[in-house]
A protein has these predicted regions:
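Rossmann-fold dinucleotide-binding core
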Residues: 1-72
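Helical "substrate-binding/catalytic lid" subdomain
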Residues: 62-172
Length: 172
């Protein structure tokens, strides 16, 4: 493991994947999910604050990557659900902009719905493959994760070609 090799040479390591996407990168409001020692995490705070708004130590080395995988798993579950809810709502004549406004103040609210125009399925398959590998290594069967892994392939196509118009910005 890289951390063990680094430790043998007196080098401190954190795993620190980032979340929240391009818009957060542009505004310096990234979320940094860290794994490593509390001392190394504390020393790094001045660095994280240059590009991130929030930073969390989740545990030992590897916990940051695990947290990132769980974030992405939930994002893609939600992204697929938004495509399906949007398609069903459009098929039933709903005004998606009005429905979105209502959902954003409901228990169905999500960051993906709030920022639908920025949701991209570019990395979704890779993300879900990571989740499935983690489940396999833990000896767990996760049927929702397996289904989402397959559905993100279609989700990517739909989002690029004919996505539900949650924001009223699609010109059809």
């Amino acid at each position: 493991m890289l951390a063990e090799k680094a430790r043998a040479k007196s080098v401190d390591v954190l795993d620190a994947p980032i979340c929240r996407g391009q818009m957060a990168a542009n505004t310096g409001t990234m979320l940094i999910l860290c794994g490593g020692s509390p001392q190394v995490f504390e020393r790094g705070k001045p660095i994280y604050s240059t590009f991130g708004k929030d930073y969390v130590l989740l545990g030992d080395i590897g916990a940051g990557q695990f947290g990132k995988a769980m974030n992405n798993f939930l994002l893609w579950v939600n992204g697929i659900a938004l495509i399906e809810a949007g398609r069903l709502s459009e098929a039933n004549g709903m005004d998606l902009v009005k429905l979105r406004d209502a959902l954003l103040i409901s228990s169905g609210a999500s960051d993906a719905l709030k920022n639908w125009e920025n949701v991209s399925f570019t990395w979704a398959l890779k993300d879900m493959q990571i989740v499935i590998k983690m489940a396999d290594q833990a000896g767990l069967s996760l049927p929702i994760a397996g289904a989402i892994k397959e559905l993100v392939k279609e989700g990517r196509r739909i989002k690029r070609s004919n996505p539900p118009d949650w924001t009223g910005c699609n010109k059809r």
